[in-house]
Amino acid sequence: MTGGEVADARVCEIARQQLKLGQRVSSLNTEKGPQLGSVKFVGIVNGFKGIWVGVDWDSGQGRHNGVVDGVRYFDTVGEKSGSFVRPHTLSTGVSLLDALTSKYRASSNRKDEPDEEMYVLSTGKKRQTKVPVLLVGKKQVEDRQGQLGILRLAALTYAGVCCAGPAGHIRDVAPSIEELDLTGNLLPDWHEVKRICDELPALRILELSCSRFPFAAAAKPLLVSSNLTGVALNHCGLTWSQVDILKHYLPNIQDLSLIGNCISNFKDGNEDAGGFVQGLQTLRLLNLDDNYLEDWQEVMKLSKLPSLAKLCLNGNRLTLVEYLARSGDRNSTSLPFVSLLCLYLGRNNLADWSSVDALDWFPSLQDVRLSDNPLTDHKTGTATRFMLIARMGSLSCLNGSLIKPRERRDSEIRYVRHVLQTMRTQSKERIIKSHPRFEKLRMIHDLPEDIWSSGYINTANSDSFANNFFAVTIECVAAGVGECASITKKLPLATTIGKLKVVCESLFKLPSNQQRLYFKDQDSPIPIELKDDLETLADVGIGPGRIIILDEI
């Protein structure tokens, strides 16, 4: 071995002592934002001088898969998530105490001077200059934050935290922290997380998103913390078999956020995929947004969690919602999802009305999100808000908007009329099968039983229906018409939207083919467009005293 080779070997050994395989590191080059990764190789690369570190980057933005010139040096998660860098371009992190002191005490020790990053531009005629902004009360806030002993909420995102630091130091300096955000840091494993939790006796909420932790079931499970009630592990590349171990790590967890992971099923790693999820007895909120769930039968494996009140499934790949218990006592504690109050299903692939009808069977459901599904698409979908409200009788909130009693009543009446209008020639059995709540709504709103005749809808009284007049107010906001007063007009319930356009043409001289009509409901913040010329005023739920808005295309 030559002298140069001996020197390289010594340097390589020193580098290996400083950088261990699996260690979390961050790039000191921040031009592209924070870059985190795991060390997969430390040593010499054939054909290149010096010591190199092979890093598998979390972002996937590397140069190769660990193979250079036909030689594999390390394995990567992605096809091009690996690259070689020099050791001096990497940071191995700081202790939690150092990060806290650097952020909070440093800010409180600054002089009361304008913030360099906050300014406004002057309005001078010759040239603009930067006028510094001084925040009123900023010094007081920073002074209070600088008192680490009373700090309750600490945010250390991408601060390079890799360890708790010497035992007892954090507890002495910042014992009151209740919420800690460690998103995008360099903690290597759950043992280090446990040390942090042990140092912070008041800690209840912990954000660990954008981390990479090994999960391994041990003979004696690691108790990370019995005090933590809320944990976020968003964008950590987790599968459910890893998450399932958390019930041993965090026995009293109530809120668990797992957004943007790799969860496609609820197989726990020990049992077959056919079993229900066990444990997690205290879990109330589970956020699984932006994962890879496709089969509703997988979601049903969560249905025995006794305390689960809110389940977020936005941005998955679900095509159908089902509920197994369609009969019996809805108050039974043995029913699936017995405690579930909120279910968010936005941005999925739900396209069938049976999914909406299934939601009506959930025993406690009050809040549902169905936006951005094929069924509810405002251009191609068939589900409007009034239909969704009518088909789910227990809801008090839909797509983030409260359902007031007036809106529910009007939606249900409008829905019944819509069914009567569109299914005149259908049998009673066919209608009830397609619209499970129709008969119940008919009774709630006191529609006469003689609407059925020989198993079909009785239209014998359609003439009296057509002659049922009421007054509506038409407001014209079309720019081409100019300013004009609103007009109140008496119209029969059987007036179609197409005929209403003819009426508006005679009143405001705006051709019907250039009109766009809206129905203004006091319980809806946004006017509802009247698109179907064949629908009647009764079908769309327009009654006495309502307002029609006329605009131009």
What residues fall within each predicted segment?
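Long, contiguous C-terminal flanking segments immediately downstream of a protein's structured core
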Residues: T2-V6, I14, K20-G22, G78, ...
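Short secondary-structure capping/turn segments at boundaries of alpha-helices and beta-strands
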Residues: V39-G43, Q140-D143
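Short, solvent-exposed loop/turn segments that connect beta-strands within catalytic domains
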Residues: E31-G33, N46-K49, G480-E483, S524
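Short coil-to-beta transition motif at edge beta-strands of beta-rich domains
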Residues: I14-L36
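Short acidic, glycine-rich loop/turn motifs
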Residues: S27-E31, W57-S59, C476-G480, E552
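Basic/aromatic-rich interaction segments and small domains that mediate binding to polyanionic partners
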Residues: L28-T30, F41-E79
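Short beta-strand segments
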Residues: Q35-S38, R72, A485-I487
